[in-house]
């Protein structure tokens, strides 16, 4: 019996409204923000795009290891999706990677496969300092990195 009471007490603390408070003590702030985002955009699509962006960042770091200064500022997924064919996308990606001394063929082919499942999301872009309307992966990481 005592174990049941203890279990109920722990469970009630985990479910208490004070645990659901968002930043600044507002109840459910984080939960409500997710709800608004997923109403406008499909959450699964957003997660897929994020996964592709993380994959691109990781692979670029591998390809340019030791030569980070030569790394392209960005690989804009929306620009690639706007192109008509995979051949055009492939040429665009290869143009971005022209300074890479490591083999890039596998990266290009894998990225083309990952792009097949994505759709252009024009509302997701935020203005960049360069004024072209997009953030580079490096700029985005710097903007969202913890202090």
UniProtKB/Swiss-Prot annotation:
The modification Phosphothreonine is found at residue 38. GO terms for cellular component: cytoplasm. Residues 138-147 have a biased composition (Basic and acidic residues). It is found in: Cytoplasm. Residues 1-37, 118-147 are annotated as: Disordered. Residues 1-11 have a biased composition (Basic residues). It comes from the Eukaryota. Keywords: Cytoplasm, Phosphoprotein, Protein phosphatase inhibitor. The gene is CPI17. This is Protein phosphatase 1 regulatory subunit 14A.
């Amino acid at each position: 019996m005592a174990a049941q009471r203890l279990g109920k007490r722990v469970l009630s603390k985990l479910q208490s409204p004070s645990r659901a408070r968002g930043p600044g003590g507002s109840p459910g702030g984080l939960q409500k923000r997710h709800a608004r985002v997923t109403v406008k955009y499909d959450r699964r699509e957003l997660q897929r795009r994020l996964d592709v962006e993380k994959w691109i960042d990781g692979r670029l770091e591998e390809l340019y290891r030791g030569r980070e200064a030569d790394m392209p500022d960005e690989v804009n997924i929306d620009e690639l999706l706007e192109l008509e064919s995979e051949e055009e996308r492939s040429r665009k990606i290869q143009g971005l990677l022209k300074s890479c001394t490591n083999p890039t063929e596998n990266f290009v082919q894998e990225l083309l496969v990952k792009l097949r499942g994505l759709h252009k999301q024009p509302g997701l872009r935020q203005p960049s300092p360069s004024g072209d309307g997009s953030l580079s992966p490096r700029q985005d990481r710097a903007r969202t990195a913890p202090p």
